[in-house]
Amino acid sequence: MISVPDLQLDAKALLRACKLNVFDFDHLVAGQPTFAPYESDVRPAPVMDFTSGFDTWIEQVKTNSPKNLKTVRYKERKLGREQGELRFEWASPDPEVLRTLLAWKSDQYRRTGRVDRFAQPWIVELTDMMHAEKSSDFAGVLTMLYAGDVPVAGHFGLRTATTLVGWFPAYDTEFARYSPGIVHHLQMAEAGANDGLHMVDMGKGGKEYKDWLKSGVLYVAEGRISRPSATAAVHWMGRTPFNKARTIVMDRPSLYRAADRVLKGFGRVRSSMQQQESPNAAVKEPTGAR
């Protein structure tokens, strides 16, 4: 909530004033007085912290995993040698570059059995609006790594004057052997630090690369506030059991790996069925990325 520090409101009165029956939150800054009583789970969100400079951060990354950093730097050089000189673009204004990134992300969602967010036109429209916003305290930042003239990996996120929030990273799977996503993240970190950022918030969630790129953590919460109503009851039945099951899976690496395998298997089957239905066409699902 954007407010003076330590402001505490009656959360249910706030919902009533907003004409809401339910506020289901996730990635909310933990410990806010208004919402803390309704937090059901608090988790660390890894961050890249540049307050002491980029060089200090990269030394921390090296300490976290010297082997990983050495491997990525090798692949970075190999990508440049074999595919063309590397070029990194910070804050691209080009909507066609955004289209490319969203198409990669849609492909990733489908390939891994996840729901394609960009099949929803309103999400694409919202992303476009945020990409166009360029104020000093709020902006959509689109970054792209090129090998020669070919885009290979990118990211779209939101920034304040000092913080970039990680949102949609993706890469072209044709270049997967070079680990272009991690190469991009290292270059994005350097460009962001040079542009005055103090931090990149990578968000909570189970990606191993976050563990060795992080140099600190923030704490974020999820939870639910509701007012007595039929709508709130229906919402509870539809969401709460799922959220609890997801938390159990995320807390147990063996369950997470098993669930991930199942989803990826579903993605392969879905893609195979689409190829059989249209053998001469590229595998594409309807998407709002136009």
Model regions: which residues?
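Acyl-donor binding region in acyl/amide transferases
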Residues: M1-P44, L158-L218, R224-I225
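Serine/threonine-rich low-complexity intrinsically disordered regions
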Residues: S3, D10, D94, K134-D137, ...
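A general structural signal for well-ordered secondary-structure junctions
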Residues: L20-N21, E85, D107, S136, ...
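A conserved beta-strand-loop-helix scaffold within acyl/acetyltransferase catalytic domains
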Residues: D26-D49, G53-R177, S271-R290
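Active-site/acyl-donor-binding loops of N-acyltransferases
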Residues: G31-T63, A161, D195-R257, V262-G267, ...
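Short C-terminal domain-edge/linker segments immediately following a structured domain
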Residues: F54-W57, E76-R81, R117-W122, A132-E133, ...
